[in-house]
UniProtKB/Swiss-Prot annotation:
It is an enzyme of class 6 (ligase). The gene is serS. L-serine binds at T237, A238, E239, E291, S390. This is Serine--tRNA ligase. It comes from Lactobacillus acidophilus (strain ATCC 700396 / NCK56 / N2 / NCFM). One of its GO terms (molecular function) is transferase activity.
Length: 435
């Protein structure tokens, strides 16, 4: 959530910044108008409360002196009514103000490419050239099906579209990938956490998914009243429980920066994705992802973003997967992010790079919503900065391995770093199948 004081004191700058993220200037004008009225009512209420205290003392004094206090009592009643009216208005205006603030995205960093969509993203660097073959490479969904290690048809029978079964070497490869990621992340100084996969609304609001993105997630409903959702949602990313671990907490400065990592399933409705990536592992309703989260001081967050991005790059490099890093435009960056780097891995069969990680600096945007603060050496409280990044999306990594390490005979060579995680298996060949 943005700081209303920053908007109030820098209205033109705020309009210019948020215009690059699709926010109309009238929305900020309305917000500041509400804020002005709210602060005026709050000041009047505080003045009347001070007056009520004075009148209360006068009444007590008159009663001690056995004097008539009826006029003062009547005045205090009228003051009380006015206070009640003003406080109600303040509450209503606060609710309106928060309604708008909770739906405004983060201010973009000055270094962000300006543009409405991903066509304005800018390549920052590239690692290795795209994989070349002496034969026409197969798509990972064909490889997985032919090898008998991925089964979308039976998953569709059981769960519907955008679900998959991993079988035999496929399941082993998926497990090898996320165990490798977790081991590498812990070597890089991250503490591993196994978080809850169901979170409450306050947590979803803390990281910015609610109230704006209800349609993108799966919420648990009450069996006795299906129209009434319970206060529980399946996590769309481990970022939610990891960041909210620190919600309403005060961290001592000497504990920062904090680095945590987790592997979890991620559940997404993929609202608005009809017709996109209908085959394969790229866009699923349920998938596994390893997440990295950092909590740090404001003056450290930009350096920490570079470290976070390099941590994610390190994983792709050890796997030998070609990729490039792109800086997202103001119109393509996520709601909570001030700056995002996407890592996109090369997919030979698609002949293009596909996102496998997003590394974002959310500055104090999430910390303000979730009240994540730290106490400095002088005892003063400050909002922390939060960062998050995929390290990495597991299913997409499996897809990239299948496509980049495929052989002409349809087998897939296991990347060297994964062989110990695959019980020594160096090549995936056709499975006999369960049925």
């Amino acid at each position: 959530m943005l700081d209303i004081k920053v908007i109030r004191e820098n209205l033109d700058w705020s309009k210019k910044k948020l215009a690059t993220r699709g926010i109309k200037p009238e929305e900020l004008d309305e917000l500041v108008e509400i804020d002005t009225k709210r602060r005026k009512d709050l000041t009047m209420s505080e003045q009347l409360k001070a007056k009520r205290n004075d009148v209360s003392k006068q009444i007590a004094e008159k009663k001690r002196n056995k004097e008539d206090a009826s006029d003062a009592i009547a005045e205090m009643r009228e003051v009380g009514k006015e206070i009640k009216k003003l406080d109600k208005e303040v509450d209503e205006l606060t609710e309106k103000q928060n309604y708008i603030l909770l739906r405004l995205p983060n201010f973009p960093a000055d270094s962000d490419p300006i543009g409405p969509d991903d066509s304005y993203n800018e390549e920052v660097r590239k690692w290795e050239e795209p994989t070349k073959f002496d034969f026409k490479p197969k798509a990972h969904w064909d490889l997985g099906t032919d090898l008998g290690i991925l089964d979308w048809d039976r998953a569709s029978k059981v769960s519907g579209a955008r679900f998959v079964y991993y079988i035999g070497a496929g399941a082993l490869l998926e497990r090898a990938v996320f165990n490798f990621f977790l081991d590498e992340n812990t070597k890089d100084g991250y503490t591993e956490i196994i978080p809850p996969y169901l979170v409450n609304d306050a947590s979803m609001q803390g990281t910015g998914q609610f109230p704006k993105f209800h349609e993108d997630v799966y919420t648990i409903v009450d069996n006795d009243d299906p129209d009434k959702p319970r206060d529980l949602t399946l996590i769309p990313t481990a970022e939610v429980p990891l960041v909210n671990y620190f919600r309403n907490e005060i961290i001592h400065e000497n504990k920062l920066p904090i680095n945590v990592t987790a592997m979890s399933p991620a559940f997404r409705s993929e609202a608005g994705s009809a017709g996109r990536d209908t085959r394969g592992l790229i866009r699923m309703h349920e998938f596994r992802k390893v997440e990295m989260v950092k909590i740090c001081k404001p003056d450290e967050s930009w350096d920490e973003l570079e470290k976070l991005t390099h941590n994610a790059e390190h994983l792709l490099q050890k796997l030998g997967l070609p990729y490039h890093v792109v800086a997202l435009s103001t119109g393509d960056a996520s709601f909570t992010s001030a700056k995002t780097y996407d890592l996109e891995v090369w997919m030979p069969a698609q002949d293009k790079y596909r996102e496998i990680s997003s590394c974002s600096n959310c500055t104090d945007f999430q910390a303000r919503r979730a009240q994540i603060r730290y106490r400095d050496e002088d005892g003063k409280l400050h909002l922390a900065h939060t960062l998050n990044g995929s390290g990495l999306a597991v299913g997409r990594c499996v897809a990239a391995i299948l496509e980049n390490y495929q052989n002409e005979d349809g087998s897939v060579t296991v990347p060297d770093v994964l062989v110990p995680y695959m019980n020594g298996m160096k090549k995936i060949t056709k499975e006999s199948g369960l049925i």
